[in-house]
Regions:
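SAM-dependent transferase fold signal centered on methyltransferase-like domains
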Residues: 1-146
Length: 146
């Protein structure tokens, strides 16, 4: 028989949307959001966060074991970060959202895409010799179609 559930004070619970936390972006999700682990171990997907950055995250919701968050403060920025070239870029309601990585330089985008493809192929047991390099578009913004 299990004992009574231990209560966690609301002020320390990350389910409370007002509780922000600081974390290191350790990976990128398939949709382009940064993967940040909260101090309690819950994984958050954070739009606008890039590999290696340290960010203060404001939780915005979640589903099961995965939380969603927004960057409240960027404490350490990636060296590849830049001003997005498209005026429609952003993560707020009413902004396009079709090119989530425009805030980093194009070579960094290509490198991240290459790493994602290689990781997926490895999971599928596809030989690394069969994987071709990612091909850059002739013009950085000329291939997007959202």
């Amino acid at each position: 028989m299990l004992g009574p559930r231990r209560k966690v004070p609301a002020s320390t619970s990350l389910n409370n949307r007002s509780s922000s936390f600081t974390g290191h972006v350790r990976d990128l999700a398939s949709d382009g959001r940064g993967v940040v682990t909260a101090p309690d171990g819950k994984v958050f997907l954070v739009a606008g966060a890039w590999l290696g950055e340290v960010v203060e995250v404001s939780p915005t919701g979640g589903k099961g074991q995965i939380g969603f968050g927004a960057v409240k403060t960027r404490l350490e920025s990636a060296s590849v970060r830049r001003q997005p070239p498209c005026r429609h870029h952003g993560f707020e309601d009413g902004q396009c959202g079709g090119c989530p990585w425009q805030f980093v330089d194009y070579p960094a985008q290509l490198s991240a895409k290459d790493q994602r493809v290689r990781a997926m192929c490895t999971q599928l047991d596809i030989s690394a010799e069969l994987i071709q390099p990612i091909v850059a578009a002739p013009g950085e913004g000329q291939y997007r179609n959202r």
